[in-house]
Design a protein with these regions (language model features):
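RecB-family 4Fe-4S metal-dependent nuclease core
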Residues: 1-239
């Protein structure tokens, strides 16, 4: 960890097809086949296709990183959390917010919080308020990454740039994963220093949590039925 990643290292890796495929095979053995690294499981047709797609994504990611070099790799699969207090009519509840950040890297005084995505398109919320307003196209991904950014702003001194890296979009020369905000049909601003938005985000988050834990505010189903399609809790509400 805290390794400086340079252009030469990534170029050498990009040109080493055997090593890249080895990385993919190691992951398949560990996470899919659940076998030791000494074994050589046979891939069926679908698994071969998946392996090829992952290998291509890996190359696109490395090419995107190559354009960003040199940078410092800070960590991956990094758990972050923060203790919070929530006011309720019955007193204060102590709770905790947090999650796992896919990747952290730093360059020129900026810490990027990177969440990987393998499908869909980048969301561009108009403002912080929109993340807390029920809507069909509200960006849960941006909300999650902003939450991590708010936590990291208080844990270290660097500027924090929340980023969503859509791997299938990363091949273009000008691609940047840093989240952008702005009204439709107006210029978009990259969120390169989250501290500008942190206070508003935290204030709105506090209000949201207090509403959730307030027994006097009814817990109602969303009116946007499409949101229920992939909801983990639809077996409870029977929608």
């Amino acid at each position: 960890h805290n390794n400086v990643i340079d252009k030469e290292t990534l170029e050498a890796l990009l040109h080493n097809e055997v090593k890249l495929q080895d990385y993919v095979d190691v992951a398949f053995k560990e996470l899919f086949f659940n076998v030791s690294q000494d074994e050589k499981p046979e891939y069926n047709g679908v698994q071969l296709i998946n392996s090829a797609v992952i290998s291509r994504y890996l190359k696109q990611l490395l090419e995107n990183d190559l354009r960003y070099t040199p940078f410092t790799f800070v960590g991956s699969e990094q758990p972050v959390q923060e203790d919070i207090e929530i006011k309720t009519p019955k007193g204060i509840i102590k709770s905790r917010i947090g999650g796992i950040i896919d990747r952290l890297d730093s360059k020129d005084g900026t810490l990027r919080i990177v969440d990987y995505k393998t499908g869909g398109d980048a969301d561009t919320p108009p403002n912080v308020e929109s993340l807390f307003t029920p809507a069909k196209k509200r960006s849960n991904y941006v909300f999650q990454t902003f939450l991590y950014a708010a936590i990291m702003c208080r844990k270290q001194p660097l500027k924090v740039a929340p980023s969503l890296l859509y791997i299938h979009r990363a091949a273009t020369e000008t691609y940047s994963p840093v989240i952008q905000m702005g009204e439709s049909r107006k210029p978009k601003e990259p969120v390169e220093d989250f501290s500008i938005y942190e206070t508003e985000f935290r204030e709105r988050l506090q209000v949201l949590l207090e509403d959730i834990f307030n027994p006097e505010i009814p817990f109602t189903q969303t009116e946007i039925v499409e949101k229920c399609t992939y909801c983990d809790f639809k077996t409870l509400c029977k929608r």
